[in-house]
């Protein structure tokens, strides 16, 4: 976001008991699509090649720890947390020890986790929603392009009955 290419950017790790999806999401103006994708790929490559430096680790810890209480604020978020604990066979100690566990994560462990969890930049799948005429040729550099109109039945929920 510091490059001014996006309105927002985030990555989401689908936490399951088996490997899941890692999603990088962003919203950018059409003319900046390729530049934003290239930047995301370069960040992913840097994570694989160099991991996080001490400043990056501290920043990530602060962000993750700061967001954790919001996972316990509402009835819905508590229900999600209970489901998460059950799914992963965790108890209350997960919540009680979350901060200390996060603080104890060593840079080497973080680097190993990045290598195991985040996809290789050469094996990415892109889902782009936007002006196909404006980005079609430019995004072809990432691989074969399949276009689906937003009016296709698979994109549109069935009408209410």
Give the predicted meaning of each segment.
Residues 1-49, 54-107, 112-116, 120-129, ...:
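M16 family metallopeptidases and their MPP-like homologs
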Residues 71, 128-161:
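An aromatic/glycine/proline-enriched structural segment found at the starts
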